């Protein structure tokens, strides 16, 4: 590619999926430019690495580009897309550019409705501890690396494979992980769950004859597609028929202690520096891959025990003063689907037994809120106190029967929790200040703008102090 394409432009370069690819390309020596609607820490980092960043979208931004990279979130009437089309500059989907990177190395692609980012981070961390120095492209910031991407010198590239727009079918990795299959982004699949499962089967058909599919057999939908996978399969999970299995699981002090059982290997005692059974499953995927690639047990144990997590995945902000003179524990999480939320709430209950759990939740997308409405009501009813915001639209038109007010009314009808409804995330810090008490565990959750709330709370605390 490099002898033809010198300058690559990204429309929406600050996004989680785009920025990692851009960073790897910068480090490979390409001229990289990009635009986004606002400046953030990601765009600042890319600029410091040498990328040319423009705030706002304008036709002039693509000047000199040999290719323009877009995601499915970029509208066809974007001025940079229109300019590229007019100038006959190739417009490349994000997943296609990721596929080009995978051609340079041996790809390890992590797919699944939930857990992709954490699992990708765990795989990258364990392989790095084993001396394989992988390249990685992650949908969140790997805290130990301070970035969501890195160009390694090793043979492997570890990346998320996105099923939300079916773009993972552009990838041709040598190892695939499927964490789970759940009903999300169903507009892509015509609201046909069978089509979604078929897409995952087709994903495994991208593997070479020497490749392998590493799949979580605890998920019933994953288990259903195994007979249709024609390539070698490695089963992981808590189930009795898993080839890489966790036993003797014990949650202590926010960590998961367990024993790994692998066919033909001695049992391996592991301490995972993350809470929750779902993270035990994510770690098992990393252990399965690392074992297959010859990473030592010592390196596996060290990487998991010292894993510092991923930004916005049960990210701890420490202790914050409460209005009653005590303090509460503040945590932030990206969860935005009821299944993810339930897993995070269960992890919090396990990590902080007996403590009151307060959730500040911003629903993400009206269509998801509509499609999963009853499930949202059920999972939100399991917390002890709730601050609820209006739905983060993500470009969608509002749906009156699936907005924050409708969700609040439904929760009050069920009667297990009385939500405090606020119109915007700017109101969340004040609302939490009134709700949170000494000893509480407070979680801010959602895939939208609520991610900026914890830092704002900490900043407010420092200013008062």
Swiss-Prot record:
Where is ATP bound in this sequence?
112-118
EC nos = 6.3.2.8
| UniProt-listed InterPro entries | Mur-like_cat_sf, Mur_ligase_C, Mur_ligase_C_dom_sf, Mur_ligase_cen, Mur_ligase_N, MurCDEF_pg_biosynth, UDP-N-AcMur_Ala_ligase_MurC
Q: What pathway does this protein act in? A: Cell wall biogenesis; peptidoglycan biosynthesis
Q: What class of enzyme is it?
A: ligase
Q: GO MF terms on file?
A: ATP binding; UDP-N-acetylmuramate-L-alanine ligase activity
| Biological process, per Gene Ontology | cell division; cell wall organization; peptidoglycan biosynthetic process; regulation of cell shape
Spell out the protein name for this chain: UDP-N-acetylmuramate--L-alanine ligase
What species does this protein belong to?
A: Burkholderia vietnamiensis (strain G4 / LMG 22486)
Q: The organism's lineage?
A: Bacteria, Pseudomonadati, Pseudomonadota, Betaproteobacteria, Burkholderiales
Q: Which gene codes for it?
A: murC
